């Protein structure tokens, strides 16, 4: 049996950030993931300058040999009506490919890594957690996304009782013919809101790569909404006529609608495993990074790994992201005051789509980069 101070399950942005943050803590850390890296990852894939700053990533250095698409404009509309385009002037976000971004973050981790290793068992034994009958630690951190096996240890775990966002998307490298037929521009992601405001679709070009997808909180209608959106985008020339391959599905919880416990004795959840995606946009990368850094701060200071000692992590999450709603409302993307028929007019407004939808809901420009002492 190999002993560690903590085991991190999941080597995505949350897990790799936590491992890196604990590098000089003196703790022996193991990070486990079911896949090898680099690996395919379904995600629209954009990160704000705040994320780059928090992770100390130099955009110029990162862009060498990797896709990094500067974003200066957004094109936003409601399905079935004309879009509004806003120019923000400066670079307000970056497009990345998750297969590259996640591999880059993991490459900066110097702790032991056990990749291509599915977690088949997690057993409590003498105050420690034993994973796959091979590795043992007093603390296990779930960073494995929505269906993280560690999340099953807390509360009711992942399941049908949760109100999840279901998304389908595809990302592919365009041929020269496809690229010339695609009106979507790299520096201008397109966001298209469903008319019932229970989701939105996107068209995001990153150099020669194109990402198209749609996410909703009622997945039984997801395929129909997606097919209608794709046909509309094809008919207007926003995307090429010939799309390769199948759309891939994934799921996640919005912060205000999630009810997962964040800690228990010897257990913590971070990132999508904890249900931290921003409620208005569904973005999970920044909450994943920040939750990992907040967790590292608590782990570094904790005298033991009891639930009471780890509860300060839950308090820090509430302080950073707000208190979760006790009764989740029925709307997904938007507050109650933005409802039809008002929404149709608001989505035609340059001020609203720029100041509220883009800068507040999607870019979170009013929230400064996280500063923690780890």
What are these regions (language model features)?
Residues 47, 53, 79-101:
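Dinucleotide-binding Rossmann-like beta1-alpha1 core, especially the glycine-rich loop
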Residues 118-121, 218-295:
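FAD/FMN-dependent oxidoreductases across multiple families
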Residues 15-16:
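N-terminal Rossmann-fold NAD(P) dinucleotide-binding loop
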Residues 36-75:
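N-terminal FAD cofactor-binding segment of flavoenzymes
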Residues 11, 21, 107-239, 275:
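Predominantly flavin-linked oxidoreductase catalytic cores and closely associated redox partners
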Residues 7, 20-43:
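Glycine-rich FAD pyrophosphate-binding loop
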Residues 297-374:
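C-terminal helical "tail/cap" subdomain of flavin- and related membrane-associated enzymes
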Residues 1-12:
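Beta1/beta-strand and adjacent pyrophosphate-binding region of the FAD-binding site
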């Amino acid at each position: 049996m190999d002993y560690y101070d903590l085991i991190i399950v999941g080597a995505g942005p949350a897990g790799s950030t936590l491992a890196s943050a604990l590098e000089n803590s003196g703790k022996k850390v193991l990070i486990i993931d079911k896949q090898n890296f680099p690996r395919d990852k379904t995600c629209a894939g954009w990160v704000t300058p705040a994320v780059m700053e928090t992770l100390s990533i130099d955009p110029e250095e990162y862009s060498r040999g990797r896709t990094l698409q500067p974003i200066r404009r957004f094109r936003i509309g409601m399905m079935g009506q004309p879009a509004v385009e806003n120019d923000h002037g400066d670079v307000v976000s970056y497009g990345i490919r998750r297969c590259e971004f996640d591999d880059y973050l993991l490459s900066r981790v110097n702790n032991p890594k056990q990749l291509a290793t599915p977690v088949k068992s997690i057993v409590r034994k003498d105050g420690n957690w034993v994973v796959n009958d091979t590795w043992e630690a007093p603390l296990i951190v779930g960073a494995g996304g929505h269906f993280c096996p560690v999340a099953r240890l807390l509360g009711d775990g992942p399941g049908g009782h949760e109100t999840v966002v279901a998304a389908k998307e595809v990302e592919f490298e365009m041929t020269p013919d496809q690229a010339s037929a695609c009106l979507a521009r790299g520096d201008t992601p397109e966001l298209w809101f469903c008319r019932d405001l229970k989701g939105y679709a996107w068209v995001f070009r990153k150099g020669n790569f194109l990402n198209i997808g749609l996410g909703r909180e009622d997945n039984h209608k997801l395929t129909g909404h997606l097919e209608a959106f794709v046909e509309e985008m094809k008919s207007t020339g926003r995307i090429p006529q010939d799309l390769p391959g199948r759309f891939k599905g994934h799921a996640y919880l919005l912060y205000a609608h999630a009810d997962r416990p964040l800690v228990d004795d010897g257990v913590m959840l971070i990132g999508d495993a904890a249900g931290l995606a921003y409620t208005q946009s569904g973005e999970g990368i920044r909450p994943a990074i920040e939750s990992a850094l907040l967790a590292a701060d608590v782990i570094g200071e904790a005298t033991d790994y009891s639930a009471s000692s780890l509860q300060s992590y839950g308090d820090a999450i509430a302080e950073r992201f707000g208190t979760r709603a006790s009764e989740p409302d029925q709307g997904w993307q938007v507050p109650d005051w933005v409802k039809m028929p008002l929404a149709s007019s608001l989505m035609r407004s340059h001020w609203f789509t720029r100041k509220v939808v883009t800068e507040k809901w999607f870019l979170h420009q009013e929230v400064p980069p996280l500063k923690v002492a780890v």
